[in-house]
């Protein structure tokens, strides 16, 4: 995406606000109307620039809006991928998480898995038996 310089500054402003809120564990005021992305492409632009501002290693990716009903309710036309940063990745059976690290947190079910090898694109669908040794 190559926004004009004015639009770039508007989207970059939102990315910086979001990145700063992430690093400081704070909330932002609602974005200014002119900062709101007008398309999926602009939203990914903000997400990419927010990640640059945060500057932390990526430990994985998450996918939101995975059900058709959720996409319908939220007005999305596809799933929504997002980065998971290493400072908020917790490994092991016992972890102590401080609630102030997650302002206005809500409980939500998450499923995680690890890809043990690359999964190439192919013409036929992957089956459970195909994936058993690839995913852990």
Residues covered by each model-derived region:
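Active-site microenvironments in enzyme catalytic cores
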Residues: 3-136
